[in-house]
């Protein structure tokens, strides 16, 4: 999508759709100005009882020349217009422009944000909310959407805000496509192929470990999960190396269960087995982030992406409840629940990631229903052994408009993972389940390595769509990871 600034005012701008944001208290003055060009707009606003409140919206088709469509958006009180409200208004403008091609002109008051930030927020919102996945339809619906966004009445400094938008959004869209695709399409091999495509297109390094390679490295936890599937597991390591000196090295680890039946602890009832295609949402996020990072080429930061991908299925070879397996570090794990498989795959993935000697490791996983119960479907949970890393990720999430909330890593809860026979069990008691899951993962992180775990089970999917996310896969995590990596360059 093309982004630019327009120096034209509301009287002069000539594009296809003009969207104007009005705060409460400014409606009459702005309506009077619009009346000079769009006769009858004042009466239309009164008839609609448009007050400028958040959610107020009027769409009209002006007579005569000029824009095909005029969109007036309520923004609420001026002092309450923050970045989240700007993002929402830009998304509403884009949705109101569907059906028109050409350019969308957008004027929003950005007093509470600097011009560069406002430009980035609006551009990301417009592109992301216009996304629609029609890959699996025989006859895709014809769509007419704006091809360009022009921001009106912003200072020239705002231009730099567009720099990373298309690359970041392309990563989000890749993640959405991977999560949304059915499990007969996105398999472990397909994830490896996606990584290969990114490596080829952007000059990254790629290593894919096959089952025999994983056996040689002693990845018994990962391989135990995979043994019930006819599809071979793939352990994927994608590397971005910057030109020049490497000042920071980070690892992004994503859970890559392309389908999770639950194993012998089969998912039933409310477990929504039909939606378990999205159990690879963590791998989608890190692959999407790597696609964006590879295009943006941040200086000084080396990025390692690690995904242990397989299916969790049921057959005569599948792991049993009660089996004891050994991770690559020699730690033994009693599997008291085969449906807590993601942490087993992540155990060996985290150990491998730490072998790369990173300054920080961040893992993303659709790990627990407990996190969804605690935080709902708009927030991910964050656990970390390092305050600086947690704060940096929180800032990156806020910049990207992705909900993230730090959760306690309470050590006393680790007692719930004690096993009579093995070093630990893979699940603890139901209360505090997302915390014990994080404590389990922590056991596989090198002692002095900064680490964060982000449970994205809630926001990975949106049933109805909201804000910049259409219904379906959200691509959650890509913007947070990209912003975090860029902040270190």
Curated annotation (Swiss-Prot):
It is found in: Cytoplasm. Its EC number is 3.4.11.1, 3.4.11.10. The keyword Manganese applies. Its cofactor is Mn(2+). NCBIfam families: PRK00913.1-2 (NF002073), PRK00913.1-4 (NF002074), PRK00913.2-3 (NF002076). Presumably involved in the processing and regular turnover of intracellular proteins. Catalyzes the removal of unsubstituted N-terminal amino acids from various peptides. This is Probable cytosol aminopeptidase. It comes from Synechococcus sp. (strain CC9605).
């Amino acid at each position: 999508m093309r982004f630019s600034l327009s120096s034209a005012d509301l009287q002069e701008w000539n594009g296809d759709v003009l969207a104007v944001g009005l705060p409460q208290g400014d409606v009459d003055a702005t309506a009077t100005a619009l009346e000079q060009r769009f006769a009858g707009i004042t009466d239309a606003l009164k008839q609609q009882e448009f007050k400028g409140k958040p959610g107020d919206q009027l769409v009209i088709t002006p007579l005569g020349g000029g824009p095909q469509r005029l969109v007036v958006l309520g923004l609420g009180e001026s002092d309450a217009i923050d970045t989240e409200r700007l993002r929402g208004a830009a998304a509403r403008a884009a949705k109101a422009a569907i059906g028109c091609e050409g350019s969308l002109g957008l004027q929003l008051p950005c007093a509470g944000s600097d011009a560069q930030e406002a430009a980035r927020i609006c551009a990301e919102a417009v592109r992301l909310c216009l996304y629609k996945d029609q890959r699996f339809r025989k006859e895709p619906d014809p769509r007419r959407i704006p091809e360009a966004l022009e921001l009106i009445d912003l200072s020239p400094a705002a231009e730099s805000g567009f720099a990373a938008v298309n690359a970041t959004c392309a990563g989000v869209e890749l993640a959405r496509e991977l999560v949304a695709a059915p499990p007969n399409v996105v398999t472990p091999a397909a994830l490896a192929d996606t990584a290969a495509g990114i490596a080829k297109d952007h000059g990254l390094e790629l290593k894919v470990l096959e089952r025999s390679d994983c056996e040689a490295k002693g990845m018994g936890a990962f391989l135990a999960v995979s043994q019930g599937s006819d599809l071979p597991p793939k352990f994927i390591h994608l590397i971005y190396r910057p030109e020049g000196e490497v000042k920071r090295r980070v690892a992004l680890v994503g859970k890559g269960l392309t389908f999770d039946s639950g194993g012998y602890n089969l998912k039933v009832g409310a477990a929504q087995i039909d939606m378990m295609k999205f159990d690879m949402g963590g791998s989608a996020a890190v692959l999407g982030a790597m696609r964006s990072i590879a295009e943006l080429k941040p200086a000084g930061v080396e990025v390692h992406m690690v995904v242990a991908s397989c299916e969790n299925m049921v057959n005569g070879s599948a792991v049993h409840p009660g089996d004891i397996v050994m991770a690559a570090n020699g730690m033994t794990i009693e599997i008291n629940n085969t449906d807590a498989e993601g942490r087993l795959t992540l155990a060996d993935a985290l150990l491998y990631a730490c072998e790369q000697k990173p300054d920080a490791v961040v893992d993303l996983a659709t790990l627990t229903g407990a996190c969804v119960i605690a935080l709902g479907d708009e927030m991910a949970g964050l656990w970390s052994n390092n305050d600086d890393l947690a704060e940096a990720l929180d800032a990156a999430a806020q910049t990207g408009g992705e909900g993230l909330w730090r959760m306690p890593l309470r050590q006393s809860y680790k007692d719930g993972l004690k096993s009579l026979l093995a070093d630990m069990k893979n699940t603890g008691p139901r209360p505090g389940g997302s915390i014990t899951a994080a404590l389990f993962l922590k056991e596989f992180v090198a002692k002095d390595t900064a680490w964060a775990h982000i449970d994205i089970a809630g926001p990975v999917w949106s049933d109805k769509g909201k804000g910049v996310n259409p219904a379906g896969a959200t691509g959650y995590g890509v913007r947070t990871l990209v912003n975090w990596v860029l902040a270190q360059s």
